């Protein structure tokens, strides 16, 4: 995503020594794919709150998402967004980009962590071939996401419960044996995924959504008790558990609800706003 592409959005001002950190999943959490008048108003209300109070309350806002930066930007345009967050941790938290009036910049420390990993497309292809030839497990490429250096996406088509359990265990075991991280969760058709499928995302070890929380809190010296996270799906739960206040939004998936009990009353940005208003003080 080039700098000129972000010029249609406002940036939040730099927060000196932030007190609070707010981590939000993007698809079906901050951004409702089924755009309605109600969801537009809820988004505007949250944006207004963040813009009005991020300086006096010292709030650092970030989106932690499986989507790429270019995909996030396209959805922002479609959804009528006005403001970029302070940072986007895109491609499932394998890259961090900060936004300010001066432009955008990648986090070099995070990039160095990725470069130190042994992640490679060849290793992932080797895992995929072994799954196919030895276990007859087919992974279908998610071609709509394009190319990413540090994240490779597949779908696993669900069968029956016992078959799925064996297949997912095999995927996790092979990833572990190859020194590669893997994120697996049920697809959400509301976010454009197919029915009866799992997302299978290969990423470097020590990256992904929960590691973004640890990294940002440490980098900005923010107390964990002053951190908030919001999500809607199973792949958000580990991120929620890393913060002092982790919530599923009201429209969360059944899988996510079975894994995490703390929920907002409202859906999407309405749920985020209700929590921030209740907890964030000067």
Give the positions of each predicted feature.
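Conserved acidic, metal-coordinating active-site core of Asp-based
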Residues: 130-228, 235-238, 242
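Glycine-rich phosphate-binding "P-loop"
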Residues: 30-38, 200-204
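Mg2+-dependent phosphoryl-transfer enzymes with acidic/Ser/Thr/Gly-rich catalytic loops
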Residues: 4, 17, 203-282
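Short loop/turn segments at strand-loop or loop-helix junctions that form parts
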Residues: 22-29, 91-93, 146, 155-157
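The start of beta-strands in P-loop NTPase/AAA+ ATPase cores
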Residues: 20-22, 86, 227
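Short, surface-exposed amphipathic charged segments that create phosphate/polyanion-binding patches used
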Residues: 99-110, 198-201, 278-282
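Active-site phosphate-binding/coordination module
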Residues: 3-6, 41-142
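Non-catalytic pre-domain segments flanking phosphatase-related domains
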Residues: 1-26, 30-34, 45-52
């Amino acid at each position: 995503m080039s700098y000129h592409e972000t010029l249609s959005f406002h940036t939040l001002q730099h927060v000196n020594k932030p007190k609070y950190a707010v981590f939000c999943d993007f698809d079906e959490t901050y951004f409702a794919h089924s755009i309605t008048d109600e969801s537009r108003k809820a988004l505007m209300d949250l944006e207004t709150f963040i813009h009005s109070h991020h300086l006096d309350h010292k709030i650092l806002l970030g989106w932690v998402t499986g989507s790429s930066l270019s995909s996030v930007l396209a959805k922002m345009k479609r959804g009528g967004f006005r403001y970029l967050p302070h940072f986007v941790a895109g491609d499932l938290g394998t890259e961090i980009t900060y936004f300010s009036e001066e432009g955008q910049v990648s986090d070099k420390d995070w990039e160095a962590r990725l470069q130190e990993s042994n992640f490679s497309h060849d290793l992932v292809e080797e895992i995929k071939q072994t799954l196919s030839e030895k276990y007859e497990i087919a992974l279908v490429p998610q071609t709509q996401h394009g190319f990413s250096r540090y994240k490779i996406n597949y779908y696993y088509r669900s069968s029956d419960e016992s078959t799925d359990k064996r297949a997912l265990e095999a995927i996790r075991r092979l990833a572990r044996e190859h020194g590669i991280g893997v994120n697996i969760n049920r697809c959400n058709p509301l976010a454009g995924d197919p029915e009866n499928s799992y997302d299978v995302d290969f990423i470097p070890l020590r990256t992904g959504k929960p590691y973004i929380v640890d990294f940002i809190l440490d980098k900005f010296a923010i107390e964990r008790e002053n951190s908030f996270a919001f999500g809607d799906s199973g792949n958000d739960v580990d991120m929620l558990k890393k913060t002092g206040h982790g919530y599923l939004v009201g429209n969360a998936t059944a899988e996510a609800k079975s894994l995490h009990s703390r929920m907002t009353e409202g859906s999407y940005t309405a749920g985020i706003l209700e929590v921030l208003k209740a907890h964030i003080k000067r």
